[in-house]
Amino acid sequence: MKNKNKKKYAVACVTSMGLRITPENRMAVHNSNRFLLQATSAESNVLNVTSSLGPECLVLTRFVQGSPMAAFIKAQLRARNIAYVGPDVPQGGPWGYRHQFNIADSGFGLRAPRVWNDRAGEVGRTLDAKDYDTKQIFGKDGVKVLHLSGLIAAMSPETTKCCLKLAADAKKYGVLVSFDLNYRATFWKGREEELSTQFLPITDHLLQLDPASFALVTS
């Protein structure tokens, strides 16, 4: 007999997938001409540990149609035992949508690590809950935990609405919701109250980074 309580996905997350380039041998970016390319996002990085241990995980996102970078991201996710759901959005010309770049200097000695985010035109800022068949994902396939973070939730009014709607749908099917306070204060400038009034009530597991972040959402 099939176990009706069995969930297909251990953890699902809402995210905007991007690309990280890192100089070889801990060199500074401006001194380098060889870089390691990785598909990454704050939320999908949370899935990596679980998926590497065997349980399948799921990313809910958007891709740029026909983009070789989107194809690279999809291949990287498959290699990590992470499934993905999301539409391929037309680029809209050379000045249209793209996947964000994260340019990371790992630092060396007295030179501190440094990250430069290049996110103009980021396709993930347009996420829409309507893109996802929540009855299939949460109800039929099954998900144990839906993971959200303050980063994706704050990227745009659209991503805020998307996260809240998906969390509400997930809870209808008994899915636990986790929310981490990797919230990037600059993203929430002028909207800090939303963290405590909208996201805290829907959260089953709150992951804090520091006392100041915890105080912000619980004040």
Residue ranges of model-derived segments:
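Generic secondary-structure signature for well-ordered alpha-helical cores
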Residues: L19, P23, R78, I82-V85, ...
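Conserved phosphate-binding/catalytic region of the ribokinase-like
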Residues: M1-A12, A168-K172, T218-S219
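General beta-strand structural signal in soluble alpha/beta enzymes
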Residues: C13-V14, G86, N117, V177-F179, ...
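Short glycine-rich anion-binding loops that position phosphate/pyrophosphate groups of nucleotides
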Residues: M17-G18, F108, A120-V123, L151-A153, ...
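Glycine-rich phosphate/adenosyl-contacting loop at the front of the ribokinase-like
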Residues: K2-P87, A129-K130
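Conserved N-terminal subdomain of the carbohydrate kinase-like
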Residues: E56-G150
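Local beta-strand N-terminus motif with an aromatic residue
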Residues: K8-Y9, G142-V143, T203
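Conserved beta-alpha-beta core of the PfkB/ribokinase-like small-molecule kinase fold
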Residues: V145-S219
